[in-house]
From Swiss-Prot:
Its EC number is 6.1.1.17. It catalyses: tRNA(Glu) + L-glutamate + ATP = L-glutamyl-tRNA(Glu) + AMP + diphosphate. The keyword Cell inner membrane does not apply. GO terms for cellular component: cytosol. The keyword Protein biosynthesis applies. Coiled coil: none annotated. This is Glutamate--tRNA ligase 1. Belongs to the class-I aminoacyl-tRNA synthetase family. Glutamate--tRNA ligase type 1 subfamily. GO terms for molecular function: ATP binding; glutamate-tRNA ligase activity; tRNA binding; zinc ion binding. It is found in: Cytoplasm. HAMAP family: Glu_tRNA_synth_type1 (MF_00022). Catalyzes the attachment of glutamate to tRNA(Glu) in a two-step reaction: glutamate is first activated by ATP to form Glu-AMP and then transferred to the acceptor end of tRNA(Glu).
Length: 473
């Protein structure tokens, strides 16, 4: 499908949440699959709620996820003159008009209709359709409404009566609604700024967007968008509305379900690859495949494989994926991620590079891995877990004996095979249980009792460091 152009168009009123990240991913993959372009537009016309902090977080979230966009970022707020130009064109064509109805009254009528279970369809009561604002009839209407020439209007798009509006959605199929269910659409606010409903149509048209993939919560807006597209004789893009993401309990996703923003997952120690894989599988599938590389995702992605039911968050599945990607990552790359804000000596980096081979199999998160590996970089005396501290207190004599015994082993013999045989010999010689000996080594050398094999750790740390830790107790 040539010439595909998709976009991600978040509103910067908060951080990049998981639903938005999935929408961005689907648009990115669809464009990549078809050799097209993926654009980023910041919809910041709501100046009261939009913040630079949120804009920065969205851009950083996409960067962290590894989704690069084509061209420059488009800021909707910088296109207001274009929006006003198109709105005026609609007024000139008779497809939109200035409405002076008090906004609080309109809101009150809508609220009352909702309470009564009815649909409120607003039609301006202050301007007859055939009346021009400069006419005597128009001025009389102002007077009767208690208005003055200083009253500021909104611009409303005229929704045609009794027209069937049809969306050919790539996920839900054909969806219809009658225009009588829609009220006239505000396209310019009283301060002359565009509403989302209107600006998005103009911006998508001007950017040459061919395919719009977004959440199903936008479905009702799409009916309005279609009317505006038709009134302007714009080419209508293809639409695909993706079911929303629910929490594990099946309810709409909210903060009570835990981490919902991308930056939360980054702080937890989720890898970008794992997050992309996880987001992809939230509502999209390729047979029974769970582990999907970026190359496979680009090759396989299609809209037909997106389900119609809401996807549910599954943190256990995310942990499983993250563990897979951590386990298959090189020790050097993991070390780079772990030490972004830490400086270590070359010796301690060497400990970690060797120790990560075993430790990374145990970690579901990078933060967890850093905690598991901290004994490699601590200086004695180590911080002891409660269990390790109890063992040290109960086995001080054994620890001193082991320090003396191990100090007599030559550096050339400090390897797994020789150490194992000598430690067993020491236990036998001093009539000690081998389990007590291993515990008495593990507690002071690692500070924890659930680390990997103690002999492997001792080989990595080397003779001098092991003796130093045993003697520091």
């Amino acid at each position: 499908m040539p010439g595909i152009v998709t976009r991600f168009a978040p509103s910067p009123t908060g951080f990049l949440h998981i639903g938005g990240a999935r929408t961005a991913l689907f648009n990115w993959l669809y464009a990549k699959h078809h050799g097209g372009r993926f654009l980023l537009r910041i919809e910041d016309t709501d100046r009261k709620r939009s913040t630079q902090e949120a804009i920065d977080a969205i851009i950083e979230g996409l960067r962290w996820l590894g989704m690069s966009y084509d061209g420059e970022i488009v800021y909707q707020s910088k296109r207001i003159e274009r929006h006003k130009e198109v709105a005026n064109l609609l007024v000139e064509k008779g497809r939109a008009y200035h409405c002076y109805c008090p906004e609080d009254e309109v809101a009150e009528k809508k609220a009352k209709a909702r309470e009564e279970g009815k649909i409120y369809k607003h039609k301006c009561t202050t301007k007859p359709p055939s009346c021009h604002p400069s006419s005597r009839h128009w001025k009389n209407m102002w007077s009767r409404a208690g208005m003055t020439s200083g009253v500021r209007s909104v611009v409303r798009f005229k929704v045609p009566d009794s027209q069937e509006i049809v969306i050919d959605d790539k996920i839900y199929g054909q969806i219809k609604v009658n225009s009588d269910q829609l009220d006239d659409i505000v396209i310019l606010r009283s301060d002359n700024t565009p509403t989302y409903i209107f600006a998005v149509v103009v911006d998508d048209h001007d950017a040459g967007i061919t395919d719009i993939i977004r959440g199903s919560d936008h479905l009702t807006n799409t009916f309005k968008h279609l009317l505006i597209y038709q009134a302007l004789d714009f080419d209508i893009p293809r639409f695909a509305h993706v079911p929303l993401i629910h929490g594990e309990d099946g309810n709409k996703l909210s903060k009570r379900h835990g981490a919902t923003s991308v930056c939360d997952y980054e702080k937890m120690g989720i890898l970008p690859k794992a997050m992309r894989n996880y987001l992809l599988r939230l509502g999209w599938s390729h047979g029974n495949d769970e582990i999907i590389s970026d190359e496979q995702a680009i090759e396989w992605f299609n809209l037909e494989s997106i389900g119609r039911s809401p996807a549910r968050l599954d943190f256990k599945k995310l942990e499983h994926l993250n563990n897979h990607y951590i386990s298959n990552m090189s020790n050097e790359d993991i070390l780079t991620l772990m030490l972004r804000e830490n400086t270590l000596t070359d010796k301690k980096k060497g400990y970690l590079l060797q120790g990560l081979t075993e430790l990374k199999k145990r970690a579901n998160y990078l933060t967890e891995l850093l905690d598991l590996a901290k004994f490699y970089i601590q200086d004695p005396p180590l911080d002891l877990s409660e269990e390790a501290e109890q063992i040290v207190k109960s086995n001080l004599d054994i620890i001193k004996l082991l320090a003396s015994f191990l100090s007599k082993i030559g550096d050339e013999n400090w390897n797994k095979g020789f150490l194992s045989s000598q430690i067993k010999e020491c236990a036998k010689l001093h009539d000690m249980k081998i389990s007590d000996v291993y515990h008495s080594l593990r507690a002071p050398i690692t500070g924890v009792m659930d680390a990997p094999g103690i002999i492997d750790i001792m080989v990595i740390l080397g003779k001098d460091e092991c003796i130093r830790r045993l003697q520091a107790i």
